[in-house]
């Protein structure tokens, strides 16, 4: 069985979300990668060294420079003639490409798998992660997104895959890249941070969020997250959101400060290794998943904790 894996990259290096997908793909059989972009020889060379990789397909074309899914999907469909499955990270990019590929192939997409139980059988979360569904597909071609927190990252060294240039499908003419606004931060990106400090609506306003949450995060070298309630209230931008409709994270340590623990939020962080919750409501659902719980006034507890570090 040959599996094609979408490689996320920044033009020079392979991004971390790709690595767990390679681990998942290896459970199905032979692992091939697709690197698409403009001037991506360095990315392809790095990808070929990843443990478990058998082959790297390279599509070097200006049409793929900005990863417009309208251009990328036909490329992947063309490559699927020689592959049995297509796997992509369950990221914003992966979730944009995979459904288009599935539609063009006229097959079912299986989203955010947690395990590979067989060549056609997988598990995935449902009901906001409160239940795990086992899904079996009879489709000849499989299109799957992978939840990165469910699989170990493939080692970046140890592989010796071959590199092969593929024919570009070119510009589909359906979309045009205009511009991109990239938020820059010195803090770790949420999906790769080892420690995350998240705040909820109990912080009351944006000023409190910044003065309470950010100093603690800076002391710990942590990423900063937020509940949907905090985002909806305008405390922080949408890219801070952790949860079912935000980012799925699994850091070594997760601080949930002033977060009650709605099902949608728990779905995005419950796989964290250690969860520390601070909330004045001792009956808050967050304490049901917390390893360490502090019941009290966050406006007193968090500054004291920050000072002690």
Indicate residue ranges for each PLM-predicted region.
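N-terminal glycine-rich FAD/FM-binding segment characteristic of electron-transfer flavoproteins
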Residues: 1-309
